[in-house]
Amino acid sequence: MRAAHDEVVREHGRITNMKRTLLHSPPAFHALMEWYALRDTVQPFLGERLVSLFSHAISTENDCLVCSTFFRQIITESGEDPDRFKLDEREEAVVEFGRRLAKPFARVPNELFARLAATFSDEQIVALTAFGALMVATNVFNNALDVDLDGYLDPYRKDEATPAKGTA
């Protein structure tokens, strides 16, 4: 466990409450940390901004305080308002796809899939879907264990968001 802890600090600079909780089970930690590998796969064709907007859409739809606030921070620090950002058609399709992945049964209407298929290859859509699925899994993990929001994220909390009160 110590080696995994040191690796997180080396790669990500800090141990968040979520990562600290995940480190109780190294296989669980490694499974959810594949999020980073998938992010690195989709970022070249989405761009940093759309990766954050996609992840924020999923996390907001799932009402995950930890993840939605994390992405609110990224969006805010990039100079945008996380509650009022402008999207072009491509971005709109990707953000809507994220919201759909977060809904029960993750059904994606044919029309939305056609919009994605017009822009992305099959390989890219598969990577985007897997990335979104890991984002959903991360949301479920944080919500199920009521992982506390990290203090550094408090200023980015959405006004009506209630503090997490878990012990994890």
What annotation goes with each model-predicted range?
Residues M1-A168:
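Hydrophobic alpha-helical segments
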